């Protein structure tokens, strides 16, 4: 996990550590701190790779400017995603990128709301921050790819389908159809992000 996701995971692990201890215990936290900070190794490796390849650890920020990529408010992102889903000039790109990006948010946010009282706060906190950070990009083309790594949401979906075999079959079938459609579009040269 690199850049923001690895650092985000540190926050979630820290919240889980404090919650699992039941109280704030400085000594116990210090003993476990190396494990909590372990995801930072990925971020440091990413920065080191940037330094080795491009000469500066934060060179990726300059490279992202070429794609008009940066952080922006989630409301601004959702607004341009909605506009592009409704009226992007290339219908294939609208169907392959913008509409799925909007539908994924529409599916993931209610799932997060469902889970907020059923799961430990670490899971919902991490999932919320993950969703908001991924939808706070100035040119979001890869929401599906980003959300495919949002593991807490898969736990939430599993809890939603627990003891509901019809819903389980419906979701599994829908995901299978979605996977096949994604693969088909990819094989035909579609804009699969």
Locate each region found by the language model.
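Transmembrane-helix signature of polytopic, lipid-linked glycan biosynthesis machinery
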Residues: 47, 125-142, 176-192
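Long, hydrophobic alpha-helical transmembrane bundles and adjoining juxtamembrane helices/loops
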Residues: 93, 103, 187-193
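Membrane-interface junctions at the ends of membrane-embedded or membrane-associated helices
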Residues: 17-31, 157-172
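Hydrophobic/aromatic-rich transmembrane helices and adjacent perimembrane loops
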Residues: 2, 8, 141-161
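Signature aromatic-anchored transmembrane alpha helix within multi-pass, membrane-resident enzymes
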Residues: 36-40, 163-191
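Membrane-lumen/periplasm interface segments of specific transmembrane helices
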Residues: 2, 6, 10-108, 114, ...
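Juxtamembrane membrane-interface segments at transmembrane alpha-helix termini
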Residues: 21-23, 72-76, 137-143, 158-164, ...
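Transmembrane alpha-helix segments characteristic
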Residues: 114-136, 146, 170
């Amino acid at each position: 996990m690199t850049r923001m996701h690895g650092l985000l995971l540190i926050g979630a692990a820290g919240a889980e550590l404090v919650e699992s201890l039941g109280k704030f215990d400085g000594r116990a936290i210090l003993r476990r701190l190396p494990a909590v900070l372990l995801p930072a190794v990925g971020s440091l490796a990413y920065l080191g790779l940037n330094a080795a390849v491009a000469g500066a650890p934060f060179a990726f920020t300059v490279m992202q400017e070429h794609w008009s990529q940066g952080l922006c408010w989630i409301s601004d992102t959702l607004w341009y995603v909605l506009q592009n889903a409704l009226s992007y000039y290339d219908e294939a790109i609208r169907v392959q990128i913008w509409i799925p990006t909007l539908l994924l948010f529409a599916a993931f946010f209610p799932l997060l709301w469902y889970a907020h009282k059923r799961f430990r706060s670490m899971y919902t906190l991490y999932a919320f921050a993950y969703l908001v950070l991924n939808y706070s990009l100035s040119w979001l083309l890869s929401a599906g790819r980003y959300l495919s790594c949002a593991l807490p949401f898969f736990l939430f979906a599993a809890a939603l389908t627990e003891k509901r075999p019809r819903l389980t079959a419906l979701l599994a079938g829908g995901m299978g159809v979605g996977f096949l459609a994604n693969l088909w579009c990819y094989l035909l040269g579609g804009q699969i992000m």
